[in-house]
């Protein structure tokens, strides 16, 4: 029945009756109104409109997926009869596309041989496949305290300027380059410069093969922050559709989203433009439903897996804000970046007490890893509790065992720092990839007291524990 409708309504023409910013009302014959989410094309223009509401009397309310400059009442619009469809499959590899799947890298058109609608249902419950396999990142603090699962969902939470994008770039560097599968990067409402830097970095490392694009390992979809809200709202779905198509071919896919908060923000803008009543803190009333619809599609099936890493901006460093709070519920691992840790000069500024992972379970990571991680967290928690006493009375008033706990905690804190490959330009020190076994060995030695004789500065910005011993000799 839906197919018949599509055939009847495709090609039907309507005319613009109202245009307020990105919201455009179009009037169609009453018996041939487009369906919600149908894509409409403006005559003589590349602009696409997406139907959001049916107002009655043949009028539909749409969101413009592009600039609405120059629109006026009376312009003719035709119904495509289908939702927005984008190219998928091998043709997208090595390319940069916009929300509609059009190329923006000046390397010719993208083949439309395989296309898919950006609006799809999440896989059925019986198709899903849980994963217990760990994904090693080479970043000590993440591998130890909040390990990632292959086929899991990870969130990088942080306020402005604490290192979400740098952490994500390092994860891409460590995982995507060594990863045998494919990657999809969705830039949602972020800076154009970051998208440009990412593309050139991928080209330099060979992940994007400029000589033979189809041999590339990454597809990129960008809707940067100067785009209209409709583009920023849908660009995550475009990226996800490409990732789903690779997964359904039986591949293991890495799906990077930077930044999921901008997706929420675009939803807020669209909701306000459509005249919906705002909910808490001005967010759209459909916040949980919109987030759920996106996140439920990012999942692994029995055919292939999607491992997703999402940066989440935290407004005013408030993790209880409705947007990050709604995102938390969908994730397997949460990496929380802290401004307090960044202010100490410790990068990556991951808070080991706030970050969590469902994989940190002795049955998944093993007893040794679990005990070391909990030992590290216990020592850091004790230091946190003693800080007020130290501030008022000083270190001398502490009991001997507390002095020892503080000394070890400060060493752990510094050992959690690590030079990144992507930050070599800024730090001047070569990046370090630390295998999980080395990470566990190093922290086990500190917690057990085998490094009590070393100065704490020996642990700052090193890779393995052996490097800390080497650095201690130079310091001494």
Swiss-Prot record:
Family: Belongs to the ATPase alpha/beta chains family.
The reaction(s) this protein catalyses: ATP + H2O + 4 H(+)(in) = ADP + phosphate + 5 H(+)(out)
Coiled coil feature spans: none
An example Gene Ontology molecular-function term: proton-transporting ATP synthase activity, rotational mechanism
Protein name: ATP synthase subunit beta
Record keywords, A-Z: ATP synthesis, ATP-binding, Cell inner membrane, Cell membrane, CF(1), Hydrogen ion transport, Ion transport, Membrane, Nucleotide-binding, Translocase, Transport
Bilayer topology term: Peripheral membrane protein
Gene that this sequence comes from: atpD
Function according to Swiss-Prot or TrEMBL: Produces ATP from ADP in the presence of a proton gradient across the membrane. The catalytic sites are hosted primarily by the beta subunits.
HAMAP family assigned: ATP_synth_beta_bact
GO cellular component: plasma membrane; proton-transporting ATP synthase complex
SUPFAM superfamilies: C-terminal domain of alpha and beta subunits of F1 ATP synthase, N-terminal domain of alpha and beta subunits of F1 ATP synthase, P-loop containing nucleoside triphosphate hydrolases
Binding site residues for ATP: 158-165
Entry EC number(s): 7.1.2.2
Entry's localization field: Cell inner membrane
């Amino acid at each position: 029945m839906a197919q018949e409708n599509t055939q009847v309504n495709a090609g039907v023409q309507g005319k613009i009756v109202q245009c307020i910013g990105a919201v455009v009302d179009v009037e169609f014959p009453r018996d041939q109104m487009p369906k919600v989410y149908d894509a409409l094309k403006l005559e003589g223009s590349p602009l696409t409109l997406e139907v959001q509401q049916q107002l009655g009397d043949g009028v539909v309310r749409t969101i413009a997926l592009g600039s609405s400059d120059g629109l006026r009442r009376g312009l003719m619009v035709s119904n495509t009869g289908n939702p927005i469809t984008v190219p998928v499959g091998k043709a997208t590899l090595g390319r940069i596309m916009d929300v509609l799947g059009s190329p923006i890298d000046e390397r010719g058109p993208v083949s439309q041989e395989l296309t898919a609608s950006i609006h799809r249902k999440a896989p059925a419950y019986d198709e899903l496949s849980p994963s217990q396999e760990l994904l090693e990142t080479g970043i000590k603090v993440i591998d130890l305290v909040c390990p990632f699962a292959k086929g899991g969902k990870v969130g990088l939470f942080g306020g402005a300027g604490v290192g979400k994008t740098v952490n994500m770039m390092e994860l891409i560097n460590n995982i995507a380059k060594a990863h045998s599968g494919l990657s999809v990067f969705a830039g949602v409402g972020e800076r154009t410069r970051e998208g440009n830097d990412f593309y050139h970095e991928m080209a330099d490392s060979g992940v994007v093969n400029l000589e033979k694009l189809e041999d590339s390992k990454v597809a990129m979809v960008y809707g940067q922050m100067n785009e209209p809200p409709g583009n920023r709202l849908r660009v995550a779905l475009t990226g996800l559709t490409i990732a789903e198509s690779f997964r359904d071919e039986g591949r293991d896919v890495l799906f990077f989203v930077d930044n999921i908060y901008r997706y929420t923000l675009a939803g807020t803008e669209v909701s306000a433009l459509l005249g919906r009543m705002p909910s808490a803190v001005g967010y759209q009333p459909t916040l949980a439903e919109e987030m759920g619809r996106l996140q439920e599609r990012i999942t692994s099936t029995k055919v292939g897996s999607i491992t997703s890493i999402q940066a989440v901006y935290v407004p005013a460093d408030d993790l209880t804000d409705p947007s990050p709070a709604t995102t938390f519920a969908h994730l397997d691992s949460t990496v929380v970046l802290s401004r307090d840790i960044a202010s100490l000069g410790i990068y990556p500024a991951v808070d080991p007490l706030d970050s969590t992972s469902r994989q940190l379970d002795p049955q998944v990571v093993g007893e040794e890893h679990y005990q070391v991680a909990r030992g590290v967290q216990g020592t850091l928690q004790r230091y946190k509790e003693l800080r007020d006493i130290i501030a008022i009375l000083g270190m001398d008033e502490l009991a001997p065992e507390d002095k020892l706990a503080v000394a070890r905690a400060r060493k752990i804190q510094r050992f959690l720092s690590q030079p990144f490959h992507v930050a070599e330009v800024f730090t001047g020190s070569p990046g370090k990839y630390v295998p999980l076994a080395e990470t566990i060995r190093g922290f086990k030695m500190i917690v057990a007291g085998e490094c009590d004789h070393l100065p704490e500065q020996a642990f700052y910005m090193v890779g393995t524990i052996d490097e800390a011993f080497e650095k201690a000799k130079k310091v001494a």
